[in-house]
């Protein structure tokens, strides 16, 4: 959001007075809150995506990946094109809006065994994976395998976790009639939240309402519960319970971009230190 909307404001300036360039490794802007709907098929991907050049017709756009920020030299290193050649881009002023990255290191095993919901590719991967689980569960004679295939675990009860759980539950309910060997009570959704309620960012009334809706839809809610470990076919919870599963979707844990970490910029708790105008001093 930050980079695109900063450029959107800047393009209102006199175009001949400034040379404004936006660099991104995607040539489209994606509205992340809609990714769960894309994953579930509720909306087409086009409803969540807008081409950047269409949004910013007056801005020079470069489809490239930034690999390094050289603050003292006042340039950035990018790789672009099919051959991924390095280029140096000089700047007078730099707006950094790289966002954060998923931190899969916070739980042992999470990095190797979970999905995330941050990109369009993530949404497609989760959708295709779930359909694959249904296909195999419909034909397998192995009851233990079937249970793992039909246990869906979402880690994190914030906005993304709740939306992901709700959308994928709706998608699964729509799929069930087409898989004759899968009974409704065999499909189980689980959401794990460390705090005492779902959607802790919102009011208690909304949290309680969401909890009631989830329980009504037979979604297992684990509150005041954390993951302690993750394996290829199982998660272990802090309450001593474990869940056999082939599907773990993590919506928790963010960390500062590696590029920011290596930039030499002043950081505190993984965030760039700025003044009240969001300027880095020094």
Where are these regions (language model features)?
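Short glycine-enriched, charge-decorated loop/helix-capping segments at active-site entrances
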Residues: 35-41, 111-115, 206, 264-265
């Amino acid at each position: 959001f930050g980079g695109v909307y900063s450029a959107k404001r800047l393009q209102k300036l006199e175009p001949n007075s400034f040379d404004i360039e936006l660099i991104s490794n995607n040539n489209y802007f994606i509205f992340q809150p809609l990714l769960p709907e894309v994953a579930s098929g509720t909306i087409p991907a086009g409803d969540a995506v807008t081409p950047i050049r269409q949004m910013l017709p007056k801005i020079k756009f470069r489809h490239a990946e930034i690999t390094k920020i050289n603050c003292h030299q006042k340039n950035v290193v990018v790789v672009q094109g099919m051959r991924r050649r390095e280029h140096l881009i000089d700047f007078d002023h730099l707006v950094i809006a790289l966002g954060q990255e998923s931190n899969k290191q916070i739980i042992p095993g999470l990095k190797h065994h979970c999905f995330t919901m941050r990109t369009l590719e993530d949404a497609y991967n989760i959708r295709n994976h779930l359909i694959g689980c249904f296909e195999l569960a419909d034909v397998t004679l192995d009851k233990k395998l079937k249970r793992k295939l039909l246990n869906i675990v979402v880690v994190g009860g914030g906005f993304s976790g709740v939306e992901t759980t709700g959308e994928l539950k709706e998608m699964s309910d729509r799929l069930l009639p087409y898989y004759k060997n899968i009974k409704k009570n065999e499909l189980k959704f689980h959401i794990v939240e460390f705090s005492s309620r779902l959607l802790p960012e919102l009011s208690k009334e909304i949290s309680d309402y969401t909890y009631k809706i989830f329980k009504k839809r037979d979604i297992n809610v684990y509150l005041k519960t954390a993951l302690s470990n993750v394996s290829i076919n199982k998660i272990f919870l802090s309450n001593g319970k474990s869940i056999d599963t082939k599907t773990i979707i993590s919506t928790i844990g963010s960390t500062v971009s590696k590029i920011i970490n290596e930039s030499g910029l002043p950081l505190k708790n993984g965030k760039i230190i700025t003044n009240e105008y969001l300027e880095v001093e020094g």
